[in-house]
Amino acid sequence: LPGTVGTITRDDLIKFHQAQWKPGSSALVFVGDVTLTEATAIAKQYFGSWSGGAAPAFTVPPPQPVGPGKVYLVDRQSAAQTVIAHILPAPPRASPEYAAVTLADAVYAGGGFGTRLNLNLREDKGYSYGVFSNASLLRQAGAIIASGGVQTDKTTESAAEFMTELKNLAGAKPITDPELTAARLTKIRGYSQQFESLNRVAVQVVGLWALGLPMIELQREPESLLGASLAAVNAAAAKYAAPAGATLLLVGDRSKIEAGLRQLNAGEVVLLDVEGRPVK
């Protein structure tokens, strides 16, 4: 936020750099036609004098749910459409539920155009050009985030369909074998594309290092996606996709969509400005 950035001084940046940029908390990744011996020599040549150990350990507090029944509305006057998003808490990347959550999300909206939410809003109702989601499972916590732009005059109906599809995923309409098979194929085929270039390989390695996971996870990823059972995927969906745990965020023309959102009865409507500050 501007109010926060404005208080940061040059001395603050220097202190942060000195405290956090430490060799013991860093990784140097080489990908290409280079041997370990050559890479080690290069690292010593350019970073051999870098000393200082590791950065101070710190603990990030677990995320606290905002509570059910929250709908945040950001007013953008004369907006051509409304962007709808929701966020649901999810487990960290190291969780044994990782594959099941990933596949449940792929059925919901994270697996391309043939997913439930996208088929509903794009193909069936024509309210949107596309709605997608992503299961972002990080080191200490995760989230399932879905978003998409919809017609302004169909904002209320679209928001209702977001919640309906979450309810369906959480158990009202369990995931089927064909849906799970399609989700597996999408994720496994997409995973292979993450190794199409040297840069992409480096990104995968750095990502695992940042998550505190062993490099063997590069091999285990497709195996875990293949091994997750239908029962496990439906259990993960029931646990993490319940609409009561979702926080809705809408960005659009308040004058055209607020009344409908309040009639939706999805929860308290909280007005925010474009910087995320509450509007009275």
Q: Regions from the language model: what does each represent?
A:
Residues 51-56, 114, 192-196:
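Secretory-pathway/luminal and periplasmic proteins that interact with or process carbohydrate-rich
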Residues 22, 27-94, 252-280:
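An aromatic/glycine/proline-enriched structural segment found at the starts
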Residues 39, 117, 158, 236, ...:
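Hydrophobic side chains in well-ordered alpha-helices
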Residues 1-3, 23-31, 81-92, 101, ...:
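M16 family metallopeptidases and their MPP-like homologs
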Residues 17:
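Conserved, carboxylate-rich catalytic/transport cores that coordinate ions
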Residues 8-10:
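Peptidyl-prolyl cis-trans isomerase
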